[in-house]
């Protein structure tokens, strides 16, 4: 897994073509109307649907207001710099409502649950589950076979570019609603209790809890049983 450099992300955002895509349901005398070079139209007689950039389509609507009887616009972003990740060929289970931006790496057999928000430059390892409403900030990196509990936040760092991102090593379990601050590394096999706020690095194979999180014990057999990762949930 390759972590994206902060300056690469900054350059990507700076140089991207900002986009305000819209979907327009349109009705009227549409014959001969061009909705712009980049638009895709699905017109049938006097009605249809147009996909394209708002700046182009807005001009067309204004110029042809005598021909266009009515229209409805669907729009969910303005001057967006980063598109959503194309999910069609990702070898993972991604449930409805997850928001995953472009330039995110997702390993095979990972699971992304409803409402998760995953920002640019994040890395998710093979077999890792990102539970409901988790937030992975920019460049947050999670290893293999982890479980990030519902509502948890792994803080992101894109600026300042010198800042170190959150790194979660393999086989880590993070409980619900935990917060891991910028620059923290969670060591291999560690467990972070629900609701913990982690401000310092966590040693491998230890359990931390509290606000701020502190070590309460080393991993033992009882803890392993309570935090077992089930591969059956990760099968495609």
Swiss-Prot record:
Catalysed reactions, as listed in the record:
(S)-2,3,4,5-tetrahydrodipicolinate + acetyl-CoA + H2O = L-2-acetamido-6-oxoheptanedioate + CoA
**Which InterPro entries does this entry report, sorted A to Z?**
DapH, DapH_N, Hexapep, Hexapep_transf_CS, Trans_hexapeptide_repeat, Trimer_LpxA-like_sf
Q: Name one GO biological process term.
A: lysine biosynthetic process via diaminopimelate
Pathway(s) per entry? Amino-acid biosynthesis; L-lysine biosynthesis via DAP pathway; LL-2,6-diaminopimelate from (S)-tetrahydrodipicolinate (acetylase route): step 1/3
**Assigned keywords, A-Z:** Acyltransferase, Amino-acid biosynthesis, Diaminopimelate biosynthesis, Lysine biosynthesis, Repeat, Transferase
Q: Which HAMAP family match?
A: DapH (MF_01691)
Query: This protein is called what?
Result: 2,3,4,5-tetrahydropyridine-2,6-dicarboxylate N-acetyltransferase
Q: Provide the gene name from the record.
A: dapH
